[in-house]
Regions:
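N-terminal auxiliary segments of SAM/dcSAM-dependent transferases
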Residues: 1-20
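Conserved alpha-helix/loop element of class I SAM-dependent methyltransferases that forms part
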Residues: 29, 39-62
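Conserved class I S-adenosyl-L-methionine
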Residues: 61-70
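Conserved SAM-binding loop of SAM-dependent methyltransferases across substrates and taxa
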Residues: 71-83
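Conserved SAM-binding strand-loop segment of SAM-dependent methyltransferases
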Residues: 107-119
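A short acidic, Gly/Pro-enriched loop at the edge of an enzyme's catalytic core
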Residues: 120-131
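A short glycine-rich, Lys/Arg-flanked "PGG" loop and its adjoining helix->strand segment in the class I
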Residues: 144-159
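Substrate-binding/catalytic lobe of Class I Rossmann-like enzymes that use SAM or dcSAM, i.e.
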Residues: 166-168, 172-278, 284-287
Length: 289
């Protein structure tokens, strides 16, 4: 990751109370899936988790590693749905790690472990049946090295499932170069926008088995739901913003978060959701590795 500490400050060290009031019930800080008939963020979160586990071909009893677990939506879902599995979740955020541990204790879940560690320094002697990652690789730059590490951590018949947001044909960096780069400066320093095909060019150690695409409209609806929840909770959230950003900057940061959700919604809605989308990929180890 180019600037992991900066990305942490921008997103993941913001108090959990903000995300608890802004995200859905499972605190999924990534794209939800709004299939026909779903009209609530809670339902859309759950459907996205179900689809991810189905595509990752997870079965009860497996050893699972999640890279970049966020607020634990997938980690906790897997721990509940696959009670005989053993799950290790990696996060570089202390506040996220503490939240997941506390939630797991409250739900009497004993089949998961959360490690608070920088992905750049993480290593593991353990081997896993499944490795999963949801919107973490967008914060990383050296994908070939990461794919090699993932391959090493997989058992011979293991699988790697990756969920990323992406542009339909162009990969680009988020860099703070001038006054127009407010999203890079305040929300996504050091990040990248992959292209949908980018993972397919990195198959020295992993081989693609299957891939799927979600229309960008799913992310548009997700971001607009976050915005609505945030606006609805303004009275409760305002003291938190003053405590986090200081009274002099609370209003500016309130508007920045609103603009961030609005800008992302419009981005993924562009061209009827066919320009920026979400990609799902299932990899296996290359034969002989």
């Amino acid at each position: 990751a180019e600037l992991p500490h900066k990305a942490n400050e921008q997103h993941y060290e913001v108090p959990a109370d903000f995300f608890a009031r802004t995200l859905g019930r499972r605190l999924k800080y990534s794209c939800a899936y709004w299939e026909t008939g779903i009209d609530s963020l809670d339902e859309a979160e759950l459907k996205a988790l179900e689809i991810s586990c189905q595509r990752a071909q997870i079965e009860d009893g497996m050893d699972i590693l999640e890279l970049g677990c966020g607020w634990g939506s997938l980690t906790l879902y897997m721990a509940e749905r696959y009670p005989n599995s053993r799950i290790i979740a990696l996060s570089n955020s202390h506040s996220q790690g503490n939240y997941i541990r506390e939630t797991a204790r409250a739900r009497s879940l004993q089949n998961l472990e959360v490690l608070t560690e920088d992905m750049n320094r993480f290593s593991s002697a353990a081997r896993f049946d499944r490795i999963v990652s949801v919107e973490m690789f967008e914060h990383m730059r050296n994908w070939p090295l990461l794919f090699e590490l993932v391959s090493d951590w997989l058992r011979p018949d293991g699988r790697f499932f990756m969920h990323i947001f992406a542009h339909r044909n162009s990969a680009y960096l988020f860099e703070d170069r001038d006054a127009n780069d407010w999203m890079s400066r305040h929300f996504f320093s050091g990040g990248i926008m992959p292209s949908l095909d980018l993972p397919l060019f990195i198959q020295n150690h992993l081989a693609i088995r299957d891939r799927w695409v979600w229309n960008g409209r799913h992310y548009e609806k997700t971001c607009n739901a976050w915005l609505s929840n945030m606006d609805r909770s303004r009275e409760e959230l305002w003291p938190l913003f003053e405590a986090t950003y200081g009274r002099d900057f609370a209003r500016a940061w309130w508007m920045r978060w609103r603009m961030f959700f609005m800008a992302c919604a419009e981005l993924f809605a562009y061209n009827d959701g066919q320009e920026w989308m979400v990609g799902h990929y299932l990899f296996e180890k290359q034969p002989g590795l």
